[in-house]
Amino acid sequence: MIRVSVVGAKGRMGSHVVEAVRAADDTELALALDAGDDLTQITPQNTDVVVEFTVPAVSLNNVLTLVRQGVNVVVGTTGWTDEKLDQVRAALAETETIDGRKQSVFIAPNFAISAVLADVFARIAAPYFESAEVIELHHPDKVDAPSGTAIHTAHAIADARKAAGLGEMPDNTQTDDGSRGAVIDGVHVHAVRLRGLNAHEEVLLGNAGEQLVIRADSFDRISFMPGVLLAVRKVDSGEFPGLTVGLDQFLDL
């Protein structure tokens, strides 16, 4: 059995993770911690993998603490920048092995299989279209915008276009006033916050006379749980030492 501790266990996502860990045949709940709890309770003696779902303001410090504690970590909190990822890599470089295996941290912009596949499809399609934009739609309680998933998708589109030798996208906008959204690596990203939504993303790709729309919808947070459990199993396997970003790294694509 994989011993799993959950940090952020009382949150919207964390509570679902607790239930999923208890329900799975190959995982058991070790500790369920939330804001104010001491993370040094988590050690290799009681935990194989920690799942961290908190908020961007504290997630980096949580992960660095857990790395120092010597445990493997699966992170679902968004708001990760290249600078923060570099801090995690540096912390991992200073750690010792766990039972002869190098410590692992996994960070996912999204755990929904549909969203991960949509990102992959967008990367494949991007070189074949002149224009591409991303729209992400979430509930109004989400604290970050644009979403980590949308940022990840925008970078994937930009990388695919650069690899194909494409230049800038056509855009003759003269006045903006913020209506064109954020620009991530040259890709416009628009964020919608609306009561009744959960987590949704559209990628719009256009050529003269045609359009391709790639859309992923997560209507319930339960849709993230298969991805979370997959990440827990992969991290525990020891096959992915160091830092891994993106659930697509664990899929046979």
UniProtKB/Swiss-Prot annotation:
GO molecular function (one): oxidoreductase activity, acting on CH or CH2 groups, NAD or NADP as acceptor
Keywords: Amino-acid biosynthesis, Cytoplasm, Diaminopimelate biosynthesis, Lysine biosynthesis, NAD, NADP, Oxidoreductase
Residue positions binding (S)-2,3,4,5-tetrahydrodipicolinate: H139, G148, T149
InterPro entries, A to Z: DapB_C, DapB_N, DapB_N_CS, DHDPR_bac, NAD(P)-bd_dom_sf
Pathway(s): Amino-acid biosynthesis; L-lysine biosynthesis via DAP pathway; (S)-tetrahydrodipicolinate from L-aspartate: step 4/4
Ligand binding (NAD(+)): G8, A9, K10, G11, R12, M13, D34, G76, T77, T78, A108, P109, N110, F111
Alphabetical list of PROSITE patterns matching this protein: DAPB (PS01298)
Recorded family membership: Belongs to the DapB family.
Protein name per its UniProtKB record: 4-hydroxy-tetrahydrodipicolinate reductase
